[in-house]
A protein has these predicted regions:
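C-terminal motif of bacterial Sec signal peptides marking the signal peptidase cleavage site
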Residues: 14-15
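Flexible, low-complexity junctional segments that flank or bridge functional domains
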Residues: 19-353, 428, 445, 450-464, ...
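A substrate-binding/cap region within the structured catalytic cores of diverse enzymes
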Residues: 322-394, 402-405
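Short, conserved helix/loop micro-motifs enriched in His/Cys and acidic residues
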Residues: 403-417
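Sec-dependent signal peptide recognition
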Residues: 2-8
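Extended C-terminal subregions enriched in glycine
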Residues: 413-435, 440-448
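Loop/turn elements at helix/coil->beta-strand transitions in domains of secreted/extracellular proteins
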Residues: 265-267, 294-298, 410-414, 437-440
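Extended, charge-rich low-complexity interaction segments
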Residues: 358-377, 471-491
Length: 525
């Protein structure tokens, strides 16, 4: 939320040697530099330089982008002009692009936009590489560290073995509680839900070199790790030799073949690792639905699914609605428009601005149709958590889904496996299914995000920044997706053996719930 004058004015003042000596005092960690002073690969984009003048130009561009293209400019506590001015005041004559990227990442991490900031440069392969995925640091753990939702498991992702089978959880590193290390990682993680911050913070644990920087601790090629058992009654301490490159594979567990081996024949299982839009994939999903008509129950596994397309939802949801039921409103949103839109040369399309999200304005939904009648009935109860300003945004758009003419899963128990790795289109998927007859969400709360991200390139540093362009709301409760997320009906975390394919207690519980169900309704509620 902008609370001060335009950054351009502030920068003009700086050019005359006038500045407020206290204006950057609250942003000490954000304006910090020196992350990339050690010897680096000369071809690494983070090793390049940007001058003070070039950086200030990019800061002015970013300030304008935040004002005119960021959907949550008035919804969060980010005072972009103030923080960008603080960065500008502290700029050296020239700096590493990596340091500048870290400053921008930390600044925009004050927002609620789960898709932001994702500051990225171009790597040797010509691909965009996010600084959040490759922050500074020269020391890494030689094994994977993954979150169950509240605890951290250490394992070898190649051999699929726990590092300490009797003590699978990491309790402390260098004598410091694991939660404090995850808190240190929050400097580059957006101010979203607690589960999003924990999930993304846990992903940074492997880069212990970076976290030591954030905690102002000395660098070392070793780390003292305290492992503990399940009930925390016994612990063992190990000195771990660190490595110079990350071994984290960022796999999305479980692998489909691992899970299918555990599924009985009378239960249908489908693993959605990503919300795909590929026609062949969607066709195979639709075929699976048809082939599963005679099963006793259904398990849809979206654990670690970080989003993608809404097509899997549009393929499945019609088969969960009774053929005689009304369509359901799933999502409501308004798009942040470019200056001057709508207007001459920038007229509003008849189908609206969000057709690629399968969302339509009310004018594009004919009166008398089932979709329009469902919308008219739903609208009086819609009280958005935050109302976007009238100026600068499109009309409201809505995602409405109706039943299939021959729904396959009505009357069957449907268990959806979820976790805090679910985000974006997966949040839409979960919110649309939550509360439907026969559907039970099992796992941990999703991260929370839906904002139709747009990528913008800063002209002098060539850094990319992604910003939310849509204020997106859950139809079921009028709340935003960003900063909220979706809660499960039954909370359950995975056990350590899940990460090495030794067991899957969540999947076993889903099978039990189906076995216990007589009609699929009200499981776990």
């Amino acid at each position: 939320m902008k609370k001060t004058g335009l950054l351009a004015v502030a920068l003009m003042g700086l050019g005359c040697g006038v500045s407020d000596p206290t204006s950057s005092s609250h942003y000490t960690d954000i304006v910090r530099t020196g992350y990339f002073d050690s010897e680096m690969n000369v071809s690494d984009w983070r090793n390049e330089f940007v001058s003070r003048e070039e950086a200030r130009i990019d800061l002015k561009v970013l300030d304008s982008l935040m004002t005119y293209h960021y959907a949550y400019n008035e919804a969060d506590n980010l005072d972009e002009s103030s923080v960008l001015q603080a960065i500008s005041e502290q700029l050296p004559e020239r700096m590493r692009v990596g340091d500048f990227a870290m400053q921008l990442q930390k600044a925009l991490a004050l927002s609620i936009d789960g898709h932001a900031p994702r500051i990225a440069g171009v790597n040797e392969a010509g691909e965009r590489e996010r600084i959040e995925d490759n922050p500074p640091g020269q020391h890494y753990f030689p094994f994977e560290l993954r979150s169950t939702g509240s605890r951290i498991v250490a394992f070898d992702g190649v051999r699929r073995e726990l590092i300490e089978p009797e003590y699978p959880y990491v309790a402390k590193i260098d004598g410091i509680e694991i939660s404090e290390w995850i808190e240190a990682a929050q400097s580059i993680i957006v101010d979203g839900t607690s589960q999003l911050r924990w999930h993304r913070g846990a992903r940074q644990l492997a880069n212990i070199g970076f976290l030591r920087m954030e905690m102002y601790r000395a660098s070392s090629d070793q780390a003292l790790v305290l492992f503990e058992n399940h009930d925390r009654s016994s612990q063992v301490e190990r000195m771990v030799e660190l490595v110079e490159a990350s071994v984290a594979a960022r796999e999305r567990y479980p692998f489909a073949e691992d899970a299918r081996d555990r599924i009985p024949e009378d239960i249908a299982y489908f693993r959605i690792r990503r919300m795909e839009s590929d026609p062949d994939y969607i066709a195979s999903f639709a075929a699976w639905i048809q082939d599963s008509r005679r099963v006793r129950g259904v398990i849809v596994d979206i654990r670690d699914n970080g989003g993608g397309s809404r097509l899997p939802l549009l393929t499945l949801l019609p088969h969960l609605l009774d053929v005689d039921s009304e369509p359901v409103v799933v999502n409501a949103g308004r798009l942040k428009l470019s200056p001057g839109c709508p207007g001459p040369g920038c007229e509003a399309p008849e189908e609206g601005y969000l057709a690629n999200r399968f969302m339509l304005p009310i004018r594009a939904i004919p009166e008398g149709t089932p979709e329009r009648m469902a919308l008219d009935e739903w609208l009086p109860g819609f009280t958005p958590q935050w109302s976007p300003p009238a100026e600068g945004f499109s009309d409201w758009h809505y995602l409405i889904v109706g039943p299939d003419t021959d729904p396959a899963f009505v009357g069957k128990p449907i268990i959806v496996l979820m976790n805090n790795g679910n985000f974006s289109a997966s949040d839409i998927f979960l919110s649309a299914l939550k509360g439907r007859n026969g559907v039970t969400l099992l796992g941990t709360a999703s991260s929370g995000g839906s904002a139709r991200q747009n990528e913008h390139i800063l002209p002098r540093s060539d850094l990319a920044v992604r910003l939310a362009s849509m204020a997106s709301f859950q139809a079921s409760n009028s709340r935003l997706y960003d900063g909220v997320g979706i809660n499960p009906d039954i909370h359950m975390e995975p056990e350590p053996g899940f990460f090495v394919n030794a067991s899957d207690l969540m999947l076993e519980r889903a099978i039990e719930l189906i076995r216990e169900s007589r009609g699929g309704s009200h499981i776990g509620r």
